[in-house]
Amino acid sequence: MDVSYNWLNEYVDHDWSPKELAERLTMAGLEVETVRPLGQSLDGVVVGKVTAVREHPNADRLVLCDVDLGDGAPSQIACGAPNVAAGQKVPVATVGTTLSRPDPDDPEALQELTVEARELRGEASNGMICAEDELGLSDDHAGIMVLDDDTPVGTPFPEYLDAHGMPSTDAVLDIELTPNRPDAASHLGVARDVSALADSELRTPTVDTPSPGGPVAEEITVDLRDEAGCPRYVALLVRGVDVTESPLWLRRRLTAIGLQPRNHVVDVTNFVLHECGQPLHAFDLDAIADDTIVVRRTDDETPFTTLDGEERDLPEDTLLICDAEAPVAVAGVMGGANSEVSADTTDVLIESAYFDPSTIRRTAKALDLQTDSSYRFERGVDRDGQVWAAARAAELIAKLGGGTVVPGLVDEHPSPPAEKTIALRPDRLTQVLGTEVPTDEGTRLLGAIGFDVEAGEDALHCTVPTWRPDVSIEEDLIEEVARLHGYDQIPEPERVPVPSRTPEQPPEETLERQARQLLKGLGYREIYTNSMLRTDRAERFNVPPAGSDRAPVVETKNPISEEMAALRPRLLPGALEVMQHNRNHGQEALRVFEFGRVFRRAAEPDDPIVPGYSEHPALLVALSGPHAPTGWDTEPRSADIFDLKGTVETLLDDLRVPALQVRPRDAGATDEAPPVTQHHIDVAAGDTPLGTVARVRDDVAADFDLDTPVFVAEFHWAALVDSATAEQHRDYEPVSRFPVVDRDLAVLVPADQPVGPLQRAIREAGAPLLRRVDVFDTYAGEGIDEDTKSVAFTLRFGADRTLTDEEVDARLDAIVERLAENHGARLRQQ
């Protein structure tokens, strides 16, 4: 954002040069990226009086002027301007003066001209009568600049400019505003900070602000149909206006910050915008049907031609300013060509409104149209600045172009915001800053930037000004005091107090860090994905992990785009997008994990935080592609669900989740409709569901251009943490000094029988002597009945004594009997 040094100085006094001011502002949080000098010294340019004008004997387009420069005999100067006339006071560049102006072929470069005494078509010319562009004051080259009649002849022209509030030199400060400082998006906003830094009074222009109602309310009707998109709409009316060129001071203000002057009405609205930060729009009242303004949204795609002459297709739900028949402006972004002010305009309707920031942000993005107005509305303007800005513009329009401001105003403001007061404790201020800022100094600094501060017993009670939407908590006030007091004024501590004990971290943080380290060690990469996505995709994946109930998708109000219209119900769609991106860039082996929050409607309607909604932490682990890089000593194979199951078991064992149960879900038992995963394996701690391991359906994976199987594990992280941190009793078991006994056992079971339940049955029946059970072989084929498979286990028995064969055989018999009863297993004979 560009700020004119001279313009800024109209509102506050200080002793700093442009460079020094830039340094002060940067240290106070308004980062000045560059300081660009403007204008030229104009030494050698004086005020002259044209005493006579006569034709040039040898040139039709030139005249010869006798000009009194106040130094004796008049000087003869040849001039080609059409408006030169005897009796005028004009700026004259005397012989030897060097002038510079931007090169039309390269605006960043300057063209220099040194005025010399010379002959033009046989006649002497001793100087140059100057136009505004030749002096670097504007782009106007229509004629010479004519000065006030009472200006003394011979006055140095820079003195004339200074006397009229238009110094010949200026500087432009390019400030990089952060999104949390919309209040500084104007000259008054920056001047407010300067007044605090310089301990100087802020001079806000005095404006007569009318009260709602009056004659204008009888002439103009405002129908506010969308209070959410436009909480406030103010309208003023100026009649009998003669639209004309703006005076030089106004044109210089605008050109200094890179704006092109148009006419005095449009220029005034731009001036007020950059003065106070409130965007305005001026309508030609004759173009407003029935003198009625309607604020509404589009029902469907609507063609509309904006002020820049572009016909645009406005998307459905775009906020519009309309008259009784048709749209006349895109709210907060740009006006329409059908209602713009022209040279024939006589009655001007001034709009000053507050528009919802997210609504304007979405509109500007959808139209790919960024304007000075949308820039400010997107960030949030002063909720109480609309009347002042409209009245300021109305006064200037009437003053510069004639006309009358119709008394009163229309002010549609159904729900004014409540006043916000925050307590600032001096001891807390000292604690955070590490140094004491006197209470009087803190009060002065906050008061200088608009806070109403009242001293209480233990705190300062600060009423937040309406132009500071970013201030909401005590720490925000501390930040304001710190930046204005000066970060460089806060001394470095001589020593940093170090606690004797490291503060205990919450268990969820400790376990999350532990899980991250383990998963990274197993070759998984952590990802971060957007918590917002398309509504249709959110609906497609709206199946929470095991242990959570299905609930409707949480949609966002006023989404930035259709791609961010809902909150994610699970982490899976984001992970698939990341895997798709990596696969498209040549990565075959995909192993990822993510910690993130998922959102759903709350089971309890009276949710204490956000009624009707809840969010909870989740963990996702996913893999796809080759199990390992192919080498000379390895056979290539694709990762499968057992690889992921192994990762999950390793992770939960490392986190010490007790009574871990990993068991396949019954075929067809799924809450997913339509399903996005299959072959589910439920993970639980005892009877507490923790999550699910599954394979993403191939048709779903194909939607993300993934042509290899994708396996995913999703966990309710809070439930997992609760299980891992539950009080557990662990007995120490020393290594036995006695020999162990290993036996192999092969059983025949149905082909679809999972092995996990068989292992659990073996452990239960083999207790207390069974120490370990491992699967070492599965087989189906020749010699085995169809729909049957063989599973072979190695069983290890042990005790605190030497076991006999009879004891081991008894446990084996019990195991075989349990497998037969529970799973229809029978011993394999060969």
Swiss-Prot record:
Localization annotation: Cytoplasm
Catalytic activity: tRNA(Phe) + L-phenylalanine + ATP = L-phenylalanyl-tRNA(Phe) + AMP + diphosphate + H(+)
Region (Disordered): 490-510
Single biological process term from Gene Ontology: phenylalanyl-tRNA aminoacylation
Co-factor: note: Binds 2 magnesium ions per tetramer.
Binding site for Mg(2+): D470, D476, E479, E480
Cellular component annotations (GO), alphabetically ordered: phenylalanine-tRNA ligase complex
Principal localisation: cytoplasm
Molecular function, one GO term: magnesium ion binding
Keyword Protein biosynthesis applies: yes
Name this polypeptide is given: Phenylalanine--tRNA ligase beta subunit
Organism, as annotated: Salinibacter ruber (strain DSM 13855 / M31)
